[in-house]
């Protein structure tokens, strides 16, 4: 799924008020974290992930998260990642872009 710049801007504005749902701490990014991110993406579609640790590797971890979950990186602002994945069921999609 490739997003246009207009779609990315719309998603950024929708994400502005969101709080981070997942925190990447000293335990790092493991299989349980990826499972949790997948579950949250299915429920929310658009979410924020905060890097409390591994701040120097946030771009690398963001790529891994996007690859493993099939999501799109919308932006990394400070130590917060914004990702989006369309719900597989069109009737359950909360975000229409």
Q: How should these model regions be labeled?
A:
Residues 1-97:
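Positively charged, polar, low-complexity stretches
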């Amino acid at each position: 799924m490739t997003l246009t710049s207009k779609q990315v801007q719309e998603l950024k504005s929708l994400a502005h008020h969101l709080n981070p749902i997942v925190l990447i701490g000293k335990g790092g990014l493991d299989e349980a974290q990826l499972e949790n991110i997948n579950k949250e993406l299915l429920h929310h579609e658009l979410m924020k992930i905060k890097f409390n640790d591994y701040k120097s590797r946030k771009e690398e971890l963001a790529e891994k998260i996007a690859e493993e979950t099939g999501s799109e990186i919308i932006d990394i602002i400070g130590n917060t990642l914004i990702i989006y994945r369309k719900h597989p069921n069109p009737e359950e999609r909360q975000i229409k872009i």
